[in-house]
Amino acid sequence: VTAKGPGDSHVVAFYDNGVVPVPVIFPVSNKTGSEYPDLKTPTPIDELVAMKLRKLGEVPSEVCSDGEFLRRASLDITGTLPPVAETEAFLRDTSPNKRDAKIEELLERPGYAAWWATKLCDWTMNNNRNVNNNSPEGRQGASNFWYEWMHKKVAQNLPYDEIVEGIVLAKSRLDGESYTEFCERMSSYLANEDGQSFGDQPYLPYFWSRQDFKKPEERALGFAYTFLGVRIQCAQCHKHPFDQWTKDDFDRFKNFFNRVTEYRNGSRFPDEKSIYKQMLVSLNIDTTDKDLKGNKLYRLLKTKAIKGETVPFTEVAPTKPKPALTKEKLAGIMEQINSSDIKQKKKEQLERFLEGRTATVLGGKEMKLEEVEDPREILLAWMLDESNPYFSQAIVNRVWSSYFNVGIVEPPDDLSLANPPSNPELLEYLAQGFRENNFDMKWLHREICKSDTYQRGWQPNETNIHDDRNFGRAVARRMPAEVIYDAVRIATAGDREAMEMCSVVEKRAIADTTVGSYNNDYALEIFGQSTRESNCDCDRSMEPSLLQTVFLQNDKEMLDSISRRGSWLDEL
């Protein structure tokens, strides 16, 4: 191994299932050890970042100005530019704790819940092209409910582990709820009766009923991406030479995902089929009309539900567990499978019969799933266990990346032995602190934003000018698609409209629920809004492009926003 220049990296040694990263540091200056300048480290984050910078001989940039801080924090926390009046008041304020106070204020604004619900929808893959289309709410209605649920949980500051529990263990019915009661409740959401909100219910079943999330292998891939920040695609057919996961690991892990299914037309229990048909009759729907089915039927049901009538809905629930096999019966089945005389069709039938009876969490031991009511409960318990190396690190790394445009592990969705963190002590501090503070999302935002590390200026010095991974300075970054789109609208709006947009987020792009093939917003597309379609954080692009420049200088939408009645220019 030959060093080509100063900096830090890892040398990865691997053999079979063993993967060991070895950190390597070549100081960028002679300012190491006793030669390193005294550095103020007011927070644990600052001290852990400084520990790495001291080894590198890298001196961090100065803390940014008040104006830079306010703009940065407002955009990052709420997805919103600070209004002029707020900026002027903040710059006049001489309080020594005004930055901390501003962070607390921003975390209570509507923009915080709107923007971070959108980011959680990115990571959980809320795409209106892929969500369930086999129910009256339709794809867009389901996508709206998904965002509404996320927004409500973020606004309530529900602990992250409870948000995840509501997704992982999701089912359509509440405990003890009959099919009729379930349909009445869902119909009330479409009718918006008495302020009924889908966000009030404990579960998010749409996560499990996506069109590209039905097969066990699809669910294994998506689950690992969303909640663990782990890529296991390669292990579907082979062991990647730089990763630890084998095909056997993948096959055993996917067995957790066999038993969540979608029930249409009251088909979950035998006696509910008649309830479904009676419901259609009560709605004056001809059940013998063969042309009235599929989307045509669902659109009619949606119209009736909006008018306040109770209509039947599709539901998601785990199937019944398989009965346990005796050792003798299992041995007999295996003997048949391994027999040279068995026909292929019979062999496949027996293999399907055995499938899903055992499963293994990533890096764990084999578990029996026979007679387990819901295998997802085992998955959740494993993720929330303190010894789990992925769950807490995955979310704190993603949130960190949102603030710095680079993760402690980069890419943020690739936690693996061959892709180690740039600062493992920092990642572990945040993950452990997140657990100890009961998975409080606002604790995490607060801890990051109050650090000098987050508040560094962008101006580099000779020691950190080439470093964009050790957090010694703020790295210039483009605003996300939704944020820049809203910023342009606010900047071109008249004073009253601009103030209203800053405080009312429902019509803002940061609260957009139309991600997918039915979203025809050209501006959001060219600025890289997440497509939410490939189990990869790279679905969102932060790269600049020529099309973005052309849009800002010459697009009709842009020119109309400047010249329209009520714009800032019109007011002048």
Q: Residue locations for each model-derived region?
A:
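Long, His/Glu/Asp-enriched segments that create or flank divalent metal/ion-associated functional microenvironments
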Residues: 489-553, 559, 563
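A short, structural micro-pattern
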Residues: 5, 18, 247, 482, ...
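Residue-level detector of short, conserved catalytic/binding motifs and their immediate flanks
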Residues: 9, 232-235, 547-548
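Extracytoplasmic soluble-region selector
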Residues: 1-51, 55, 170
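Primarily short, surface-exposed interaction patches in extracytoplasmic proteins
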Residues: 37-111, 116, 124-501, 538-540, ...
